Amino acid sequence: AHEGYQIYNGYMGSTSDQSIGKLKELGVNSLTIIPYSGFRSMNKPFPISYTTGAGGENDASILHAAYTAHQNGMSVMLKPQLWSWLGWTGDITMTNQKDWDLFFEYYEQWIMHYALMAEMYRFEMFCIGVEFQNASLSEHNKWDELFDKVRKIYTGKITYAANWGKEFETVSFWDKLDFIAVNCYYPLSTKMNPTDEELLTAFEKNLDVIEA
């Protein structure tokens, strides 16, 4: 389940459709669909599998959720994402260039599957990566190449979801994308009970960083 989007048993479950209906009532006009896959090593390249289980984000469930969103007047962004108990994707670091090359080869095979899906079923937006901080800062040329390859098969808007802070503020490839995306977890306060004014002031400071 996701915050604000209360589902179980995947996007094919009845509660998924109900949740999309509730979002429409709230005035939501865009839905992000996230197919997850796991990674098996923090420092070795690995083939990436696709979710196939009935309760996961398999292709059929993705298309069902996208169809339901479109029927409710929403645009759709497909945002494939890697996740693991091993650690954060931003800490994935290969030890040599050969391994980085193979890592991106595996990642390209995986992400292109979803790029083709997004094109075939007319998803309005496609997110090509999520919080690969070490990989995005050290291998920006690989990302540039991947963005170009995705554009050859996908004609919608593309982006990359950077982590707040160092990655978002220093990554070099924003000019290759249609819009900037940041997972905006900038802290607002260390207090247990901050005032509204304190939170607003902290938010505005973070907003200055984002807008810069």
Predicted regions and their residues:
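Short, hinge-like loop/turn segments at secondary-structure boundaries
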Residues: S49-T51, M94-Q97, K176-D178
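Alpha-helical scaffolding within the catalytic cores
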Residues: T15-S19, Q109-Y114, A162-S172, L207-I210
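Aromatic/hydrophobic pocket-lining residues that form the small-molecule binding cavity
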Residues: S16, N58-I62, Y107, I111, ...
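Glycoside hydrolase catalytic-domain groove-lining segments
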Residues: E57-A60, H64-S75, K79, K152, ...
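Surface-exposed cleft-lining segments at the edges of enzyme active sites
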Residues: I48-T52, W100-D101, V130-L137, P187-K205
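Boundary/entry segment of secreted carbohydrate-active catalytic domains
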Residues: A1-L23
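Aromatic-lined carbohydrate-recognition surfaces of secreted/lumenal glycan-active proteins
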Residues: S75-W88, M125-L137, D144-E169, A212
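Substrate-binding cleft and catalytic face of glycoside hydrolase catalytic domains
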Residues: L26-F46, D59-S136
